[in-house]
Amino acid sequence: MDLVREIGADHVIGRDDDVVLALGEESIDVVIDNVGGPSFGGMLKVLRRGGRYVSSGAIGGPLVTLDLRSFYLKDLRLIGCTAWDEPVFANLVGYIERGEIRPLVARTFPLERIADAQREFLEKRHVGNFVLIPPA
C-alpha cells in the first residue's frame, strides 16, 4: 500500500479491507470498480443517494449478490464501461507523456512465460500491471 501512496493516492483501502468500515455508509458519490466480486455490496452501501457505480472489470469474480433495495431506494445508477470515446485514450497518453500520471508496472514477463504471469496474477499479491513482452 505504501507503493500506491508513493504514486499519489491520498487514501488507500486494501483488497481485503471492509470498504464500509473504511469509508462509512453513504459517503461517496461515484465508485469506479475494476475488480467486482464480494466487495460489490459494500460498494453500493458507501454510495450516496443518486450515486453512480461504474464497473469495467470482474477479476474478483463476475457474480455478485444484489439486494435490489440498496439500488432503487437510493436511486443509484449502475454503469458498465468497456469502451471509451476516441479522445479519451489520446488524453491518457498525454498525461503519461507529461509525467502527470505513470503506469504502475508490477512485473514484466517474456510472452513465452504467459502461464507464469497468469499464475502470479491470480495470487493477487502484486500492485500494478503485468506486462508481456513479445519476442523481437
Question: Each PLM stretch: what is its role?
Answer:
Residues M1-S39:
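Adenosine-nucleotide cofactor-binding segment
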Residues E86-A136:
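C-terminal hydrophobic helical "lid"/dimerization subdomain
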Residues V4, V31, M43, L78, ...:
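Terminal peptide-recognition signature
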Residues I13, D29-D33, S56-G57, C81, ...:
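Glycine- and other small-residue-rich loops at beta-strand/loop junctions that grip anionic moieties
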Residues K45-L47:
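Conserved helix-to-beta-strand junction in the class I
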Residues I28, F40, L68, F89-V93, ...:
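A general structural signal for well-ordered alpha-helical segments in protein cores
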Residues M1-L3, L63-L68:
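Short, glycine/polar-rich helix-capping loops at beta-to-alpha or helix-loop-helix junctions
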Residues R49-V54, T65-V105:
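Rossmann-fold dehydrogenase core element
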